[in-house]
Amino acid sequence: FGYDEFSAHAIKVTRDAEIDIDNDVATTLIQKIEKGLKNRKKAKPTRLVFDKEMPSPLLNYLVKRLGLSTKDLLVPGGRIHNFKDFMDFPENLWKQRSIRKKVNIHPELRQASNITGIVRKKDIMLHFPYHSFDSLIDLLREAAMDASVESIKITCYRLAPKSKVINTLINAVRNGKQVTVILELRARFDEEANLHWKQQLEDAGIKVLLGIPGMKTHAKICVIKRKIQNKSQYLGFVSTGNLNEKTAMVYGDHCLLTSHPGIMADINSIFDYLEPSGFEQKKIKPLRYLLASPFHTRKKMLAFINHEIKQARKKLPSGITLKMNSLSDQSLIERLEAAAQSGVPVKLVIRGICCMHTENNKYKFPVKAISIVDEYLEHARVIIFHHHGHERTFISSADWMVRNLDHRIETTCEIFDKKIKKELK
């Protein structure tokens, strides 16, 4: 008997994902992003990953049809190219994942009847994914239902597909709270999702602001205003990571829950600046406890490094420890190199790109640099300066890159609680 033979081979095409936000004043940012999303689907291919068992005639046909011109764009692979799909597989398929330690509730919150009351008394640091992200959701839920809460202001960059954060904010506005969301539409690969969230939030009656033209809002901050006996009280949080309950299960991040009056005042100042009337004046109110990019972060970090250099040159104890995703800013790297040459012990924990030379004959001590590659993605930014033995410890949404220091709204927050400082170290 005659028969037909069929074969199937998987391919993955990577296209140029850049969305060009031009200066055409006749179109809005939303229109530009919508146009860019349409163009992305037919953008120029930059790579073809293919099944290495694919017959040459079929591969040549694909190369011709896609307009690929160099062998550098061709990557032979196996049968599966999209490993990200494994993230959505059931937990019990792999023994290693089924025996993963259960997520814990923070000890200070475990027996608490409400989180707000605890945060009013003391700072709490949540360490994701070891602590449950539900604690952050519960804080927002309490605010949504608390009759004394007047308003909630929050920034959103990347959100989960079925975001509990969004649901909580919608419930808050339904309960009569004034809710303001700074939503970043230009978060790469989340543009379409954030356009959807913008519509959802506005339909619910929430005030949605899109940040500053030409500058992404990457800060992760929130302030909740309560009115108790005609007196305003504030609490909220500063985080290194996104308000995304899905990625919080696999990304290592830190989130400070606090009612510190100075930190809350500074967060309010940042939100005032992000209002259209604020950034049109191109000025931000002086901040005392937070560092904000693009205004203060670079200058303050350089000052702290220079202080450690002076200490080392006086033969006094010194030290700098950095943990972040990327270290590529030239001016900060030059000062770190000067610190190493002066005898300052420099320790680096950099997940991604690190442009600093860690070996140099001029360094009095070798720079210790590592990258932690394990089950969780190390996303947190932590900065520690020795500072006469009274360590100055910061958490930040910003890596030490030009884009984060000069072209984005970012926040760096000093930690004052001794126990939390010890946890971070």
Model-based region annotation:
Residues 1-320, 338-342, 354-376, 382-425:
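N-terminal localization/anchoring segments of enzymes in phospholipid and broader phosphate metabolism
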Residues 330-333, 337:
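Glycine/threonine-rich ATP-lid/beta-loop region of ATP-binding domains
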Residues 345-349:
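Hydrophobic alpha/beta core scaffold segments
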